[in-house]
From Swiss-Prot:
Annotated membrane topology: Multi-pass membrane protein
GO cellular component, one term: plasma membrane
Major site of localization recorded for this protein: membrane
Entry-linked NCBIfam families: PRK10739.1
Record-given protein name: UPF0056 membrane protein BU449
Protein family per UniProt: Belongs to the UPF0056 (MarC) family.
Pfam families attached to this UniProt entry: MarC
Organism of provenance: Buchnera aphidicola subsp. Acyrthosiphon pisum (strain APS)
Record has Transport as a keyword: no
Location relative to the cell: Cell membrane
Amino acid sequence: MTEIISTTILLVLIMDPLGNLPIFMTILKHLDVKRRRIVVIREMIIALIVMLLFLFVGEKILIILNLKTETVSISGGVILFLIAIKMIFPSEDNNNEISSSEEPFLVPLAIPLVAGPSLLATLMLLSHQYLHHMFYLVGSLLISWFFTVIILLSSSLFLKLFGSKGVNALERLMGLVLIMLSTQMFLDGIRAWFKN
């Protein structure tokens, strides 16, 4: 049960729904509210399909590359640490001020904003680490995906409630939690490496 909770938190932090809120709103601002909801749901379903694909194929890719669990854990910790640093100290061009009169399809909402390289790499690493607990991983992925959908569908409410500064503060807080999780993953990998 604790594995499901920690994995769900990890995936939500990497999906970064709060960080993606302003970008989603900028890209979809020219659409009416009803159409915006349809586009968000469609893009999130596409992202889910891509994420599930990487979750189930990830282990096979790692076997082909002949990577050990310790390597996966250490590199996963480093990747997540870098993501967390970007969340705490976002750069100006990180905001991807994309504005288009066209309706987005697949890019940039589903990929790379939700199912980005960091999330797909993490899913591959998790599928290798928890090979015999795939049911829990799928459950964690679905819970975190659903949570992200709810936040993105309630984007205007969240921005009204917290304001852009409040959303930024929450994202930085999520970054701090992700730093702790990534450090733990890194240390677990080092410990396992020394044991072997």
